């Protein structure tokens, strides 16, 4: 019922729905549609132009109507939304048969919002058309107006004034200084809308990022003070603002972001306050080569983990990973020779990629970001048993060690990779058990991190944030464990858990301190 209400509402979002396995006499959807998931994004036509496409079977030419209409954005993975028709032609011409154009001008891209319904409650994955420019109320009133410039990944701005923070639509990933100018343009539209101006500007702590440079230019142009907020702290603050919290513990798992120590953070346990944070735990770091191929080859990431441990892969393992011995030797040489120019990363998403390869369900190449996460989620959702009912031979594979380093806890997954290197090729029907066992281990790791933080903090409220906690299997498992141990858990609902929500947390911190 809630999904139906959302689909028919004026907001007209895309709603994430689970595929039905049994459709009776109805024609099933082709497996080519979203093959990496058991879900589909479904929406009704939100405009007259799209409704005409749905209704075209009534045209005089007698062309057959659609059984279903599959759409996707014009922006390639990692690219910002595009408005210029000539640029759209250039982007899509190589793999497009025909273009259907219109002469309506678009001031700013504001695509459909994306929602999911879980346990009867709506969660916003992409806050855009229909929700923007509605504000996020919080427990308090901002003593000053704030303009927040978000981050480069899933860029968005927010304008905080009075008792609410108004985040913009997601703009996409910024790849140049010129592309970042749209942040100032969108902020100025919010200023016109509210008839108010910011008293200060806030941006990401990485001052070399395009969004931070644009924020600095805007602040200088208008003679405004500029402050910074670390990205993972802002993740936590966004969820805290939504629930009216001033301080809490936070688990933030995502694809990585700038850390104050010069490393890439991405699997963090923080004590979060409006005026700062303490970092208590993270996953063990690894060297990440700054090459596109390293992100596209899950098998390579798995083998690099073994290289770090000092374990040579067997011939059987290389065959299972579909990697030639000579190719592995080249990867090993490049990895060892290039580590002094690498980024040291704690990002949780790379753990997903490597584990997906170790289980044997990863593709040879990841053609889009977070692909392994979706594949693991697909198989884990198919698992018919609870985490407690998973046979021990599966659960024991995903082992981790916890070590303490000067009031800082490290979750080391080395034993997981050693175990996965020794398994026999799993059967297809075992993949759900492997995936669900991995999720159970991640939840256990989250509990271990929060338990360590509780040695130094009296906080019992825990917020879950970051892209990986958009995965309901992980968020549910983690919330259940933490609740059983006496914590009160808060999750995103009105705000996205990914980087597009960071601007809200930035505005909350800067405006209230």
Show where each model-derived region lies:
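Active-site-adjacent structural elements in enzyme catalytic cores
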Residues: 1-202, 206-217
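Conserved phosphate/anionic-ligand binding catalytic regions in large, soluble enzymes, centered on
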Residues: 48, 68-80, 254-264, 338-360, ...
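Glycine-rich phosphate-binding/hydrolytic loop that grips phosphoryl groups
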Residues: 232-253, 257-259, 298-307, 432, ...
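Short glycine-aspartate micro-motif
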Residues: 145-148, 202, 248-252, 463
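Conserved phosphate-binding/catalytic loops in two-lobed NTP-binding clefts
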Residues: 222-235, 460-465, 472, 478-502
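Short glycine-rich phosphate-binding loop at a beta-alpha junction
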Residues: 195-208, 226, 457-470
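A contiguous, well-structured pocket-lining segment that forms one wall/lid of small-molecule binding clefts
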Residues: 151-190, 312-314, 321-322, 326-344, ...
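Short beta-alpha connecting loops at secondary-structure transitions
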Residues: 278-292, 333-340, 487-493
């Amino acid at each position: 019922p809630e999904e139906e209400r959302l689909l028919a509402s004026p907001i007209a979002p895309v709603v994430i729905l689970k595929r039905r396995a049994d459709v009776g006499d109805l024609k099933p959807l082709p497996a080519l549609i979203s093959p990496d998931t058991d879900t589909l994004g479904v929406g009704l036509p939100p405009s007259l132009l799209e409704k005409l496409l749905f209704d075209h079977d009534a045209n005089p030419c007698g062309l057959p109507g659609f059984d279903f209409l599959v759409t996707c954005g014009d922006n390639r993975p990692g690219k910002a939304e595009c408005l210029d028709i000539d640029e759209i032609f250039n982007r899509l011409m190589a793999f497009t048969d025909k273009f259907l154009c219109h002469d309506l001008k678009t001031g700013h891209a504001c695509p459909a919002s994306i929602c999911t319904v879980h346990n009867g409650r709506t969660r916003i994955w992409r806050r855009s058309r229909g929700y923007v420019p509605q504000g996020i109320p919080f427990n308090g009133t901002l003593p000053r107006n704030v303009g927040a410039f978000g981050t480069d990944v899933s860029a968005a701005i927010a304008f905080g004034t009075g008792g609410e923070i108004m985040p913009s639509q997601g703009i996409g990933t910024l790849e140049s200084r010129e592309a970042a100018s749209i942040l100032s343009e969108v902020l100025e539209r919010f200023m016109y809308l509210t008839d108010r101006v910011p008293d200060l500007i806030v941006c990401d702590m990485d001052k070399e990022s395009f969004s931070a440079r644009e924020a600095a230019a805007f602040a200088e142009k208008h003679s405004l003070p500029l402050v910074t907020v670390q990205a993972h702290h802002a993740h936590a603050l966004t969820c805290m603002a939504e629930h009216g919290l001033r301080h809490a513990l936070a688990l933030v798992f995502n694809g990585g972001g700038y850390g104050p120590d010069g490393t890439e953070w991405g699997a963090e346990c923080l004590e979060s306050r409006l005026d700062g944070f303490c970092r208590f735990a993270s996953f063990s770091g690894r060297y990440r080569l700054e090459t596109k191929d390293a992100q596209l080859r899950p098998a390579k990431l798995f083998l690099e983990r073994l290289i770090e441990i000092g374990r040579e892969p067997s011939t059987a393992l290389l065959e299972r990973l579909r990697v030639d011995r000579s190719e592995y030797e080249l990867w090993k040489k490049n990895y060892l020779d290039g580590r002094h120019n690498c980024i040291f990363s704690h990002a949780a998403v790379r753990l997903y990629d490597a584990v997906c390869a170790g289980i044997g369900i990863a593709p040879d190449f990841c053609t889009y970001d977070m692909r392994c996460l979706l594949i693991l989620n697909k198989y884990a959702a198919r698992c018919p048993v609870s985490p407690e009912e998973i046979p021990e031979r599966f659960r024991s594979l995903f082992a981790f060690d916890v070590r303490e380093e000067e009031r800082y806890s490290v979750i080391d997954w080395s034993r997981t990779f050693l175990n996965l290197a020794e398994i026999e090729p799993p059967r297809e029907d075992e993949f759900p058990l492997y995936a669900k066992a991995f999720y159970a281990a991640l939840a256990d790791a989250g509990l271990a991190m929060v338990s360590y933080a509780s040695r130094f903090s009296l906080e019992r409220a825990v917020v879950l944030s970051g892209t990986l906690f958009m995965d309901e299997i992980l968020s549910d498992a983690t919330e259940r464990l933490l609740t059983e141990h006496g914590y009160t858990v808060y999750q995103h609902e009105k705000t996205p858990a990914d980087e597009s929500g960071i601007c809200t947390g930035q505005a909350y911190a800067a405006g209230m301190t």
